[in-house]
């Protein structure tokens, strides 16, 4: 009886991860199609101008926030998890970050969308970034970190912590003038897709590579 319940629960989780992966793929495809056109228009242009135009009083706050989506921030998150002796979780987090970031880098070259300072005038460029803009690597990394750690966060707080964490990192990229809204949407989609894909892998395979 207990085994049947466990199997049913596992199937339910797999169905959720498959649905999440498919949705992430669709969102990414739609965002990539629009981003490939280059300059932002409509709502994307308005949102970028509005957030990028916030006062300089936000600078130090968002400079700290954006760190958590950086390469160093990713490394720090893995080290912290490893320090808690959750070795398999740390390994899974590291592999997912590497895989997702690799996908984001490939997508940047394929889509070829330039940064805001190259496409618009009057951008408040508060940070310097090189390379293409879509999708956002910071949005990708922060999403992977948040959703990989989701099951280990307090149940009453995870629904607030995860969206807040990802949302603030994404806002920081717009405020600093290094990404457009569709860039961070694409990054979130890559992150969710990567986390979901890892969980969809057969249990035996996950155990073999020591991520489960």
Language model regions located:
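Hydrophobic alpha-helical transmembrane segments of integral membrane proteins
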Residues: 94-120, 179-193
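Hydrophobic, aromatic-rich transmembrane alpha-helices
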Residues: 74-85, 142, 146-150
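Membrane-helix interface segments
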Residues: 57-58, 86-90, 154-160
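Short helix-capping/hinge motifs at transmembrane helix termini and TM-loop junctions
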Residues: 35-39, 84-85, 111-115, 154, ...
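Aromatic-anchored segments of alpha-helical transmembrane domains
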Residues: 27-32, 98-106, 165-178
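Interfacial segments of alpha-helical transmembrane regions
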Residues: 14-24, 77-103
């Amino acid at each position: 009886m207990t085994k049947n319940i466990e199997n049913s629960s596992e199937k339910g989780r797999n169905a959720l991860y498959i649905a999440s992966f498919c949705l992430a793929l669709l969102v990414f495809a739609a965002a990539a199609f629009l981003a490939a056109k280059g300059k932002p228009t409509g709502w994307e242009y308005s949102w970028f101008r509005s957030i990028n135009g916030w006062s300089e009083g936000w600078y130090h706050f968002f400079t700290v926030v954006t760190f958590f989506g950086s390469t160093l921030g990713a490394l720090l998150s893995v080290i912290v998890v490893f320090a808690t002796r959750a070795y398999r979780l740390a390994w899974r987090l590291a592999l997912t970050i590497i895989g997702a970031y690799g996908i984001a880098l490939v997508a940047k070259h394929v889509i070829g969308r330039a940064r805001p300072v190259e496409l618009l005038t009057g951008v408040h460029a508060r940070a310097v970034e090189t390379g293409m803009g879509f999708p956002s690597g910071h949005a990708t990394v922060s999403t992977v970190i948040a959703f990989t750690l989701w099951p280990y966060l307090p149940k009453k707080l995870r629904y607030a912590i995860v969206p807040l964490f990802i949302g603030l990192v994404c806002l920081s990229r717009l405020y600093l003038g290094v990404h457009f809204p569709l860039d961070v949407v694409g990054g979130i989609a890559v992150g969710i897709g990567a986390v979901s894909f890892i969980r969809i892998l057969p249990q035996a395979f996950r155990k073999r590579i020591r991520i489960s």
